[in-house]
C-alpha cells in the first residue's frame, strides 16, 4: 500500500489508523508513505489527480485501487483488516455514524473556523466577524454534542477505542490553533488526553512533523503554517 498524505488533521487520521492497526496485530505488509507538499501545489499535479481528481490529501493506493477521502480510507482499512477499531458485526453501526458526523460536521466547521482565525489576515476584521461568530458558535455546539456522548462512555462509540475516535481526534486536538475553547467540556478534555497517550496515536501524528514539534510547534513552524494556509485558502494572492 501507499499513503499519499501531509501533516494535516485529515492526513493524520489515516496515519493514526495505520499505526493503530499495527498495534492491533494486523499484518499490513509493506506500506510506503509519500509526503505531499501542499504549499507547492503537489496535490494538483497530473500524477496526484490520477489518484484523486479532487486534489485533496490523503489518498490510499492499494494495488490497482485508489481511495480518496480520509473517512472512506478509515472504513476501507477497517473492513480489510477487521479489528476492534471497526468490528465486522452490527456494532459497526454504533461507530460509522460518528465517523460520518465528523466528516459532515466537525471537519468543515473546525476547518472554516481555523481558516478565518489564522489564514485570512488580508481580510478586514469586519468582514470576518460574522463567519467567525457563526463557525465559532457551531464548533462549540459540536463540542457539546461530543461532551454528551463522552459522558455516557469512555470512547466516542462506546467502551472501545474505534475509528470514530480516530476520525475526530486530529481536529479536536487542534482546538488552540483553531481557537475553539473546549476547556468547559471536561469529558472532551479528558478524552483528548487519553487518546494522545496511545502509542499508535503518538506515532501517527508524527508523520511529517519533526520529533520535537509533535505536540508543540516552534514559532517558525506556526508562521510557516500560517503562510501555507493563507496560500492554500487564497490561491493566487
Regions found by a protein language model. Name each.
Residues 1-133, 222, 232-237:
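GST-like domain detector, emphasizing the conserved glutathione-binding G-site
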Residues 78, 171-172, 205:
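Active-site-flanking alpha-helical
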Residues 84-88, 109-112, 155-159, 202-206:
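Short, hydrophobic secondary-structure boundary micro-motifs
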Residues 139, 198-215:
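Charged/polar, low-hydrophobicity segments characteristic of intrinsically disordered regions
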Amino acid at each position: 500500500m501507499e499513503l499519499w498524505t501531509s501533516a494535516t488533521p485529515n492526513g493524520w487520521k489515516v496515519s493514526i489508523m495505520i499505526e493503530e492497526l499495527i498495534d492491533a496485530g494486523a499484518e499490513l505488509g509493506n506500506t510506503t508513505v509519500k509526503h505531499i507538499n501542499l504549499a507547492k501545489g503537489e496535490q494538483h499535479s497530473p500524477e496526484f489527480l490520477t489518484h484523486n481528481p479532487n486534489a485533496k490529501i490523503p489518498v490510499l493506493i492499494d494495488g490497482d485501487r485508489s481511495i480518496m477521502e480520509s473517512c472512506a480510507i478509515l472504513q476501507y482499512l477497517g473492513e480489510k483488516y477487521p479489528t476492534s477499531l471497526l468490528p465486522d458485526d452490527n456494532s459497526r453501526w454504533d461507530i460509522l455514524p460518528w465517523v460520518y458526523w465528523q466528516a459532515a460536521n466537525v471537519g468543515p466547521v473546525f476547518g472554516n473556523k481555523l481558516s478565518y482565525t489564522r489564514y485570512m489576515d488580508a481580510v478586514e476584521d469586519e468582514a470576518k466577524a460574522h463567519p467567525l461568530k457563526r463557525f465559532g458558535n457551531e464548533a462549540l455546539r459540536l463540542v457539546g454534542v461530543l461532551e454528551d456522548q463522552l459522558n455516557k462512555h469512555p470512547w466516542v462509540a462506546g467502551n472501545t477505542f474505534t475509528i470514530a475516535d480516530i476520525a475526530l481526534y486530529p481536529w479536536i486536538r487542534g482546538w488552540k490553533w483553531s481557537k475553539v475553547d473546549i476547556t468547559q467540556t471536561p469529558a472532551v478534555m479528558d478524552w483528548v488526553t487519553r487518546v494522545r497517550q496511545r502509542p499508535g496515536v503518538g506515532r501517527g501524528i508524527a508523520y511529517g512533523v519533526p520529533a520535537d514539534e509533535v505536540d508543540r510547534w516552534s514559532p517558525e513552524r506556526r508562521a510557516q503554517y500560517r503562510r501555507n494556509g493563507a496560500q492554500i485558502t487564497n490561491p493566487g494572492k
